[in-house]
Amino acid sequence: MEAKAVARTIRIAPRKVRLVLDLIRGKNAGEAIAILKLTNKASSPVIEKVLMSALANAEHNYDMNTDELVVKEAYANEGPTLKRFRPRAQGRASAINKRTSHITIVVSDGKEEAKEA
């Protein structure tokens, strides 16, 4: 059984978020939370919040035991880009792309659910 949580349009570049997601992918939920608390990156608190939401979804919606859960999937996709301009010399301007992320975390207890035909 799986439970999932998504945070959309987070104002951190996906490349930076993926660095932290790589640390928790495949880990036990408790271990992943401990790693996030000690990781000194801007995306850590946001990812921790999404992970806690996924755990709460698992417990509330599917009656799963949160102690047995493992981070099955953790990925960051690119969200909408905010385009800004920086004035440069001689009347020119250069583009600044402020990138956003969609963060998705899926937790699983390792048990397969019965599929209906």
From Swiss-Prot:
HAMAP family: Ribosomal_uL22_B (MF_01331_B)
Family: Belongs to the universal ribosomal protein uL22 family.
Role according to the record: This protein binds specifically to 23S rRNA; its binding is stimulated by other ribosomal proteins, e.g. L4, L17, and L20. It is important during the early stages of 50S assembly. It makes multiple contacts with different domains of the 23S rRNA in the assembled 50S subunit and ribosome. The globular domain of the protein is located near the polypeptide exit tunnel on the outside of the subunit, while an extended beta-hairpin is found that lines the wall of the exit tunnel in the center of the 70S ribosome.
Protein name: Large ribosomal subunit protein uL22
Record's subunit section: Part of the 50S ribosomal subunit.
Lineage, top ranks: Bacteria, Bacillati, Bacillota, Bacilli, Bacillales
InterPro entries associated with the record: Ribosomal_uL22, Ribosomal_uL22_bac/chlpt-type, Ribosomal_uL22_bac/org-type, Ribosomal_uL22_CS, Ribosomal_uL22_sf
Gene3D superfamilies named in the record: Ribosomal protein L22/L17
UniProt entry tagged with the keyword Cell division: no
GO biological process: translation
Single Gene Ontology MF annotation: structural constituent of ribosome
UniProt entry keywords in alphabetical sequence: Ribonucleoprotein, Ribosomal protein, RNA-binding, rRNA-binding
GO cellular component, one term: cytosolic large ribosomal subunit
Keyword rRNA-binding appears in the UniProt entry: yes
